[in-house]
Amino acid sequence: EKEHLDVLIVNSNEADYANARYFSGFWPLFERAGVAISASGDAALMVGPESRYFAADRSKIEKIFILKEYRESADPAYPELTPDTFQDVFHAIGVTQKNIRIGVASYLDTSVVIMDGIRAAFPDAEIVRADHIMTALRSVKSKNEINCLREGYRIAELAMQQVIQEIQP
């Protein structure tokens, strides 16, 4: 609401999955994934056709939509697929108007195909970069997250000490 967004879309891919996983617990494998979040906080997970069952098993978000825009880069035809649309997703999270403001976080992880799909679905929408929202959200850490980070660094330090002991000219 502070950014005057009707929807925030956070996208991820196999190599950089953290943002979609942050909200959903799901991370894509060879496809892309996105989370659409309304200003009221209602959310939906968007995945490609190959991720339907994995997403249903892993996601903490119950609303899961299969969009062709999130398919793998090999661009399979999927003749049997009746895909969901961005309009379906937005309607499910309570965004029904057409003239809206859409923030896209993980902008660099948003493929041209995904962006074209958003623009085609909402030609009157204002689409803005919203990476700063994800950066701000992920910079706040809980006590458990801090403990996990400390443990990760402790393990990495032990591994480095072992490597240094093993190195020979």
Where does each model-flagged region fall?
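A composition/biophysics-driven feature that prefers long, compositionally simple stretches
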Residues: 1-159
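C-terminal helix-coil-helix/basic helical segment that borders enzyme active sites and/or dimer interfaces
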Residues: 161-169
